[in-house]
Amino acid sequence: MRMLLHLSILTLACVWTFAVEIPMHTVVKETLIQLSTHRALLTSNETVRLPVPTHKNHQLCIGEIFRGLDILKNQTVRGGTVETLFQNLSLIKKYIDRQKEKCGEERRRTRQFLDYLQEFLGVMGTEWTMEH
């Protein structure tokens, strides 16, 4: 009995370690596949209205995206493989929230701020969709 308990704890630790070590790009890729697979199920209730950001820079609309996901999750029959989709989306949200915590500010020299600003503007100029 004691050996069974030790094996159960060891198995749980291994599963937890594996889950923690999955790279986020793998989770995102898997979630995109699941979303495509379950699209018909997710769109079966056309009376549900979800917030869809009008802005094309998705990184600015994260809050709206996850509010819509919460509504969709509450309107969808639970269980089966669609549950994995929502678990992955939850992992992605937690990852984004952890990354946002890194936005905390720190007092630095003007040169360091300008370096950061230049990098930010470079990303904005190449990765953001600019509206006219």
Curated annotation (Swiss-Prot):
Location (main, coarse): secreted
Localization: Secreted
Entry-linked InterPro entries: 4_helix_cytokine-like_core (IPR009079), IL-5 (IPR000186)
Keyword Amino-acid biosynthesis listed: no
Entry keywords, A to Z: Cytokine, Disulfide bond, Glycoprotein, Growth factor, Secreted, Signal
Cellular component aspect of the GO annotation: extracellular space
Glycosylation positions in this chain: 45, 74, 88
SUPFAM superfamilies given in the database record: 4-helical cytokines
Residues annotated as signal peptide: 1-19
TM spans (from-to): none
GO biological process: immune response
GO molecular function: cytokine activity; growth factor activity; interleukin-5 receptor binding
Function as written in the Swiss-Prot or TrEMBL entry: Homodimeric cytokine expressed predominantly by T-lymphocytes and NK cells that plays an important role in the survival, differentiation, and chemotaxis of eosinophils. Also acts on activated and resting B-cells to induce immunoglobulin production, growth, and differentiation. Mechanistically, exerts its biological effects through a receptor composed of IL5RA subunit and the cytokine receptor common subunit beta/CSF2RB.
Family in the record: Belongs to the IL-5 family.
Subunit structure: Homodimer; disulfide-linked. Interacts with IL5RA. Interacts with CSF2RB.
The protein's name in its UniProt record: Interleukin-5
Gene: IL5
